[in-house]
Swiss-Prot record:
EC number annotated for this UniProt entry: 2.7.10.1
Protein name per UniProt: Fibroblast growth factor receptor 1
Domain writeup: The second and third Ig-like domains directly interact with fibroblast growth factors (FGF) and heparan sulfate proteoglycans. Isoforms lacking the first Ig-like domain have higher affinity for fibroblast growth factors (FGF) and heparan sulfate proteoglycans than isoforms with all three Ig-like domains.
GO biological process: animal organ development; cell differentiation; fibroblast growth factor receptor signaling pathway; positive regulation of cell differentiation; positive regulation of cell population proliferation; positive regulation of macromolecule metabolic process; positive regulation of MAPK cascade; regulation of primary metabolic process
One Pfam family recorded for the sequence: PK_Tyr_Ser-Thr
Principal localisation: membrane
Positions bearing Phosphotyrosine: 457, 577, 579, 647-648, 724, 760
Residue ranges with Acidic residues bias: 124-135
Subcellular location: Cell membrane; Nucleus; Cytoplasm, Cytosol; Cytoplasmic vesicle
Keyword vocabulary terms for this entry: ATP-binding, Cell membrane, Cytoplasm, Cytoplasmic vesicle, Disulfide bond, Glycoprotein, Immunoglobulin domain, Kinase, Membrane, Nucleotide-binding, Nucleus, Phosphoprotein, Receptor, Repeat, Signal, Transferase, Transmembrane, Transmembrane helix, Tyrosine-protein kinase, Ubl conjugation
Source domain of life: Eukaryota
Glycan attachment sites: 76, 116, 133, 223, 236, 260, 292, 313, 326
Amino acid sequence: MFSGMSLLLWGVLLGAALSVARPPSTLPDEVAPKTKTEVEPYSAQPGDRITLQCRLREDVQSINWVKNGVQLSETNRTRITGEEIQISNAGPEDNGVYACVTNGPSRTYTVLCSVNVSDALPSAEDDDEDDDNSSSEEKAAENSKPNRPLWSHPEKMEKKLHAVPAAKTVKFRCPANGTPTPTLRWLKNNRAFQQDQRIGGYKVRSQTWSLIMDSVVPSDKGNYTCIVENKYGAINHTYQLDVVERSPHRPILQAGLPANTSVTVGTTAEFSCKVYSDPQPHIQWLRHIEINGSRVASDGFPYVEILKTAGVNTSDKDMEVLHLRNVTFEDAGQYTCLAANSIGISHHSAWLTVLKVEDNKPALLASPLQLEIIIYCTGAAFVSAMVVTIIIFKMKHPSKKSDFNSQLAVHKLAKSIPVRRQVTVSGDSSSSMNSGVILVRRLSSSGTPMLSGLSEYELPEDPRWEVARDRLILGKPLGEGCFGQVVMAEAIGLDKEKPNKVTKVAVKMLKSDASEKDLSDLISEMEMMKMIGKHKNIINLLGACTQDGPLYVIVEYTSKGNLREYLRARRPPAMEYCYNPTCVPDQLLSFKDLVSCAYQVARGMDYLASKKCIHRDLAARNVLVTEDNIMKIADFGLARDIHHIDYYKKTTNGRLPVKWMAPEALFDRIYTHQSDVWSFGVLLWEIFTLGGSPYPGVPMEELFKLLKEGHRMDKPTNCTNELYMMMKDCWHAMPSQRPTFNQLVEDLDRILALSSNQEYLDLSMPVNQYSPCFPDTRSSTCSSGEDSMFSHDPLPDEPCLPKYSNGGLKKR
């Protein structure tokens, strides 16, 4: 306790000392009093999205954007929204000086941004400061007498072990000279290092004696030996590379931040909060407030108010600083920085003290030494008070933890969700103990049911989403999901303006043998859907029943099932099902219909990406279709345990959709928006084969080898070359070279606008062609519908499709 308190105290005192020592910022005398100019550099890579923001002052009356002295206007790549400008798919033509001119009543502010878009990816450039030195040494060596190779900078090669996190760029250098000029080659683990040994290859810069590997993964671990040789001799040097895989954890907040702050009335207070998180964090700033004269509710948890929360256009750097302008005495109090990700929640608090404006009489001015002493003592007093308060609070409430309900403007602070169930008391005890409180915690990967007979639990009520149970009429079951079952239902009065309107909905609920982990996952999915918000092309949360009974999560109902079965049910007669060859679909799909499906899914994924949500299981089976043929992405809020699943065994915890997974996700478990783009490419292939199974006839073990060798699925018969190129772009080996969902939306929107409604599909050709032919080792039972490498058994409703090879029927 003493050690932790000392660290906090030193953090506060150091921050105070720095603030005292910092000189005031003033403009040079030669700058006109009515104009202020700031210059900010901005670097980007080709294909990036450039976002420039103008920091607004309170007295700003108008904003103008200028590039190289010319007024900027919106184009198909440039979007201007007041204080912000966005340029998509950046290129060298976007280089220049951008000026944001804001006019106020007393002065004009001009912010200059010098934008530089490089001509090549940074990984292809070598910016080593020793390049020129190496070149000059080589020239000097060429003019000298013949000699064997020698290291030119051995002191820079002393560090042999390099431990770097995954996805970083690694560069090894072996600078040498000799006459004649030596040659350079590299070994990995004492064997020749070939380009095809790693996804994306590597680069050798002979002129700088360097080896460059972009986006390293755990499989890149090993010993790398450079051999420099000429006809007079050879030398070598070995580096050891250790790639540290990033383990998921809740956000880590820098110790001592935010720090206690003291300001005078009318000035600006600033709190900083440095957040470290591998999964994308969601950051909020909260202020502790009083309700009915009390800062603490009856259950012992304090009340808080949300001051600042992350939005679509806010960066993490913006969220790490809280500015309180023109502070008053009412602003004094406790402030909290809250950071949450998919793993958990962390928070730090600090106090704001508001002081009176000091009299300007010289006799009353404190010396710098006195001011430092006052700040140190004040900081020590507040830290001591805070530590004592925490100790007393924990002694009185040993079993309670803290968490934040981030969706309420004023709400209680709680760390985990209390779940109440009946408890049997044995013996003759007369205690009134008829219920116990169970805290929902993450279980081990076994997921053993812990709440058998769960009948009642208690969650904080959210008025924005709460639906009365008597307004919900449950109907027939629709199926079983990850957490329990899904049933059809009718909800009355979901639309507040139409209290008697009946809406058909789907309701997710727990099974009778639900575990604590199941409950935690269902609550996490519900909270994720609240946080992400609503969009036309995702399954939206409509409400929830959290009080006086089991948890019901109410979502939109989709009458036409998932996209995979939707497409298969609309195959033309030329692709008849083996069990019903006379079946004729009610509706034939045109080329434009299929492009529309892809366009809608891309729009939904673009929205999820803007909310910093990574799906990790995008496939046609997870896209649902409404009565009006609207595509809606489902299961984006599921908590998936992807780090403890054996790739070669079916487990009770889950199944990996390997046929839809990007190589970096499959081999190194790196999940990003770019890995979702790979899955979207497979979904495109599913759409244009009307629900075909990816990589048909390819065994899972062979699939891994094919992906590493760069093989990709062939173009579907009724797919245009442009759309097939889009698929192949999504399947690029380098994640950074894949298109973004925003770019995919723009391209599909253009293709959709040029499509004709009359282009009905001729699917007399096979849909399951794939260039590497493999014998079908399975029985004649149809099994083309496998969702993952674990499933080799046919689905009960799977249609048996004819097997083709090179345009002809393939013998079984």
